[in-house]
Amino acid sequence: MSDTDLYVPLAEGDLALEPLAERHRVGLRAACAQDAEIWEIYPFSYAGDNFNPQFDALLRSQPVRRPYAIHHAGTVVGMTAWIEHGAPGWSIEIGNTYIAPSMRGTGFNDRLKRLMLDHAFACGLERVGFKVDVLNTRSQAAVRKIGGVQEGVLRRERRTWTGRVRDTVQFSILRSEWEARQS
């Protein structure tokens, strides 16, 4: 599997993922501004004055992080990314995900993750990981809902932009587990 196989536009109905580019800046800024409080439990803040520096860093983060703009019916409603995790061609992480409040609780995130997981496993990957702040119980529940298996808690794994030292819950889904859920 090559990067050109994995990091491609993906779409299903009104849901589309496009590799993040400068043209997404304004739409993503507007989406991120819809929930200023959520950034307290993220490693980085995309709110207010933090947005432009974080967006610029995200654009420069390849090849380790391959970010997408998430579209619903043509409107940018968030972001997500493939993140190198483990052996290239074997394992990848889905992370850096933010979805605007209007799309939460609608099944949109479930569709998004299914689209990405289907694609990752179709590209030949064996494992997809997820790292979630221990305080982010909504995201933990979402990962469990799609079949993520909790592998453990990485204690004091990183310092967030607020200075808080976070514990991180590690999840994964294996190809065999995903295939069993789909049959």
Regions of interest found by a model, annotated:
Residues 75-78, 138, 165:
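Glycine-rich acetyl-CoA-binding "A-motif" of GNAT/NAT acetyltransferases
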Residues 53-91, 95, 101-102:
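Acetyl-CoA-dependent GNAT
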Residues 122-132:
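Conserved GNAT acetyl-CoA-binding A-motif
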Residues 1-53, 177-183:
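A short, well-structured alpha-helix characteristic of acyl/acetyltransferase catalytic modules
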Residues 105-119, 141, 145:
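Conserved acetyl-CoA-binding loop-helix of GNAT-fold acetyltransferases
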Residues 100-106, 135:
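Active-site acidic-Proline motif in GNAT/NAT acetyltransferases
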Residues 136-152:
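Conserved active-site alpha-helix within GNAT-family acetyltransferase domains
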Residues 131, 149-166:
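Conserved catalytic-core motifs of GNAT/GCN5-like acyltransferases
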